[in-house]
A protein has these predicted regions:
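P-loop/Walker A NTP-binding region and its immediately flanking N-terminal helices
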Residues: 1-163, 167-171, 184, 252-253
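Extended, largely alpha-helical regulatory/partner-binding modules appended to the mid-to-C-terminal parts
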Residues: 49, 55, 82, 134, ...
C-alpha cells in the first residue's frame, strides 16, 4: 500500500493547525462568529503559504462542516465555458448546506472571457453563493475583479515557523522515540531552502527521509541535488590562490563523474553570492547556506577582498558558457587565463 505523503498527512484541518498568518485567521474567524461573510474573497501570496488550505478551512467553518466546497483548478479549467458551468451551478441553491462555496485555485490562469463571465456573477451573486479565489500572481487579476472581492495577502512563513512545524512532524512520526539521527541544523536548512513555503519544506523533508531515515545535512544536500559544498570551497580557494591546476582538476572530476559542468558553474555562482552576503552581514539568517558551514565561512572571510575578484570571474564565465556547446573547454581556458593574471 502506498504511503500517504507527509504534506497530505499533515495538511492543517483547522486554523489552529496552521503556522503563522495570524491576522488573516483572526479576521476570518471573526467573520464566522458574526456571520458577516463576503460574496467574493481573494487569497494571494507565495506558493505553500496556506491560501488553498485556508480557503478549505474557511469554507468548512462557514457551513459548520456540512457539505463540501466546489473546487476548480483554473490552470486546467481556464476557459469561459468552464466558468459558465460554475455560474450555472451557483444559481442553484445548495441542498446539504447553507452556503454554496466555490474555491477557484490558480485563478490568474483564467482567460479574459472567463473573467468577464465571472464578473457579473460577483456583482449580482446569490445570497447563498461565496467565491474564494486563490493566486500566486495577483498582478494578473483584472482591476474590475479586485474591486469586488475582499483581498488577503499571505506572507512567507518564517524559517523558525517552518522549523518548528518540521520538528513537530518528526516527533509525531516517532523519530524522537527511536535511535534515528535528527539533526536540527538539517531541519533549519530545509526551512531556508523552502523559501517561506511550508508545503515545499514538508515535501523536501519527506524526500530526504525516503533517501535515509537519518536526517543529516549531507543527505539533505544529496536530496536536493546541490553539489557538495566542500567542492565549492575547494574551487573558491583554487581561484583565490590563482591555482589553475587544482581548479582544472575539479572541473575534470565534475565532468568525468557525468555531471553537467555548466550547471556546476551556475550553482557555484550562487554559492559565491551566499559567501559574499555572509562576509557583509556575518549572519546566517541572511543566507541559504547551512549553519554547519560557519567555521569554513569564517576562514573564507579572511580573504574577503579576493572573493570580489573571484565573483567577477565567475559571473563572466557563466555568461560565456550560457550558449556554448563545449562549456568545459571554455571554463578551463578562462580559468587558466584568470590564474595567470
Amino acid at each position: 500500500m502506498a504511503r500517504t505523503p507527509l504534506a497530505v498527512k499533515y495538511r492543517p484541518k483547522t486554523f489552529d493547525d496552521m503556522t503563522e498568518q495570524r491576522a488573516i485567521k483572526d479576521i476570518l474567524e471573526n467573520q464566522i462568529r458574526t456571520k458577516t461573510f463576503q460574496h467574493g474573497y481573494l487569497f494571494t501570496g507565495p506558493a505553500g503559504t496556506g491560501k488553498t488550505t485556508s480557503a478549505r478551512i474557511f469554507a468548512n467553518m462557514i457551513n459548520a462542516g456540512k457539505g463540501n466546497p466546489i473546487e476548480v483548478d483554473a490552470a486546467s479549467n481556464s476557459g469561459v465555458d468552464n466558468i459558465r458551468g460554475i455560474i450555472e451551478d451557483a444559481k442553484r441553491k445548495p441542498l446539504d448546506a447553507e452556503y454554496k462555496i466555490f474555491i477557484i485555485d490558480e485563478c490568474h490562469s483564467l482567460s479574459s472571457g472567463a473573467w468577464q463571465a465571472l464578473l457579473k456573477t460577483l456583482e449580482e451573486s446569490p445570497k447563498y453563493a461565496i467565491f474564494i479565489l486563490c493566486t500566486t500572481n495577483p498582478e494578473k487579476i483584472p482591476a474590475t475583479i479586485l474591486s469586488r472581492v475582499q483581498q488577503y495577502q499571505f506572507q512567507k512563513i518564517s524559517n523558525d515557523g517552518i522549523f518548528t512545524r518540521l520538528y513537530t512532524i518528526m516527533d509525531d512520526e516517532g523519530y524522537a522515540d527511536c535511535d534515528k539521527v535528527i539533526d536540527e541544523d538539517s531541519l533549519r536548512y530545509i526551512a531556508k531552502v523552502a523559501n517561506g513555503g511550508m508545503r515545499d519544506a514538508i515535501t523536501l523533508l519527506d524526500k530526504c527521509l525516503s533517501l535515509s531515515s537519518d536526517l543529516t545535512i549531507e543527505n539533505v544536500l544529496k536530496t536536493i541535488g546541490v553539489e557538495d559544498y566542500g567542492t565549492f570551497i575547494q574551487m573558491l580557494y583554487a581561484l583565490v590562490n590563482k591555482d589553475g591546476t587544482s581548479g582544472i582538476q575539479i572541473i575534470e572530476d565534475i565532468y568525468n563523474s557525468g555531471k553537467d559542468v555548466k550547471l556546476f558553474m551556475k550553482e557555484f555562482a550562487k554559492f559565491i553570492l551566499e559567501v559574499e552576503k555572509y562576509i557583509l552581514f556575518r549572519n546566517f539568517n541572511y543566507i541559504s547556506l547551512p549553519n554547519t558551514m560557519k567555521e569554513d565561512l569564517d576562514d573564507i572571510c579572511e580573504n574577503g577582498n579576493f572573493i570580489f575578484d573571484t565573483m567577477e570571474f565567475v559571473v563572466d564565465v557563466n555568461n560565456k558558457i550560457k550558449w556554448d556547446s563545449d562549456p568545459k573547454t571554455l571554463i578551463e581556458l578562462s580559468m587558466l587565463l584568470y590564474c595567470k593574471e
